Amino acid sequence: MSSVFPGPRFLSLLQQNSKTLIQAKQIHAQLVINGCHDNSLFGKLIGHYCSKPSTESSSKLAHLLVFPRFGHPDKFLFNTLLKCSKPEDSIRIFANYASKSSLLYLNERTFVFVLGACARSASSSALRVGRIVHGMVKKLGFLYESELIGTTLLHFYAKNGDLRYARKVFDEMPERTSVTWNAMIGGYCSHKDKGNHNARKAMVLFRRFSCCGSGVRPTDTTMVCVLSAISQTGLLEIGSLVHGYIEKLGFTPEVDVFIGTALVDMYSKCGCLNNAFSVFELMKVKNVFTWTSMATGLALNGRGNETPNLLNRMAESGIKPNEITFTSLLSAYRHIGLVEEGIELFKSMKTRFGVTPVIEHYGCIVDLLGKAGRIQEAYQFILAMPIKPDAILLRSLCNACSIYGETVMGEEIGKALLEIEREDEKLSGSECEDYVALSNVLAHKGKWVEVEKLRKEMKERRIKTRPGYSFV
């Protein structure tokens, strides 16, 4: 680099073109040497550091830009760090700062970014930190002043499955935009439950929105969420009425691929395949999800033999089936017990469509074979797998062994499954099923002493039997 300090525009261009951590460090060094304090450049540099694979070096350099030796960090740079970091890192950075500094220094965007991180994080601490942030924004008066914070908070609770608190935040908001309504309706739709209570709540809330939304108009996102709720409940009559309402709003499925795909999915899952096909054929633009919805609809409605032809049409149109396509189709075949068709489809994934099967696809085949009583075939299929079977797959076969009396194999698989669970320090929520599956197999063999040992271990690990699960 030249010893003459380049202007901000030149540095900005160089920043955009820097591909490696070394180049970013060189730019960083020039900024420090020449006393540059341009926050927009620092912000880009932070984004660059955070985009690189997580290393101690890049993390420290990003922190150096944000946290001075004395005093508070710059708000813009602090928020940029929260926004650009991985969710778990954002939560840790915020928690560390909030524990040592005044909350009054934080602004609206700080809370939006950290709540967004809590919504995206898979960490067990995300829900706890999010609740703490909820208390902070309420204490500072941001909650009812900022529609953005309210909506982000609602989204956070919905993503974490706490729909009761999400609804509480929604009901307390003084004003609601279409984004707010969509977040709450979408939250209900994305958490399927036994009896479809959440889907019904979504439909009731949509009716309230369409009738008295205080001048706020439903968007295409709203309608996609509502169609998803109808798909879950199977209420065809309401689905047809909503289709008419969609046309009235001006969202035409012929050109709106998201609305069109949602309609295809809704009609298919409500058992009205003719209407699904009508919408499908009218659509001028189709994406991979459109084709997947139509193919899955065929399988679910007993016309799985037509699926291969539709997949060929899909490939000829220039759209290649992907992992999601085959997961959806194999799940449908599993649901209605199309064993041979499922096996043929699985074989065609790699040979005809070039899609490498992943654990979910293998799991569908094992479950399909297990439910059909073809236990030995399922076991041999697992042994031939090029990837290690997971707990879900083993649990499926263990349950099948219990149902069909394959006690020797069931005991072997059940014990292997419990070993996986014992090695995992965190409770995943599925341990009850594993203990029950193994205990049922042992009970069939009359090994009551071992059944009692399992019960004792469950007590020690504080694993409770769920209502509806057999524990012989």
Curated annotation (Swiss-Prot):
Database matches in InterPro entries: E_motif, Pentatricopeptide_rpt, PPR_At4g14850-like_plant, TPR-like_helical_dom_sf
Keyword Signal appears in the UniProt entry: no
Domain of life from the UniProt record: Eukaryota
Pfam families found in the cross-reference section: E_motif, PPR, PPR_2
Any single GO BP term: mitochondrial mRNA modification
Keyword Repeat attached: yes
Protein name as it appears in the record: Pentatricopeptide repeat-containing protein At3g18970
Entry's Gene Ontology cellular component terms: mitochondrion
UniProt-annotated stretches for the region Type E motif: 393-472
Name of the encoding gene: PCMP-E93
Family (UniProt): Belongs to the PPR family. PCMP-E subfamily.
Organism: Arabidopsis thaliana
Record GO terms (molecular function): RNA binding
Alphabetically ordered keywords of this record: Repeat
PPR repeat extents: 107-139, 146-180, 181-216, 219-253, 256-286, 287-321, 322-352, 358-388
Lineage, uppermost ranks: Eukaryota, Viridiplantae, Streptophyta, Embryophyta, Tracheophyta
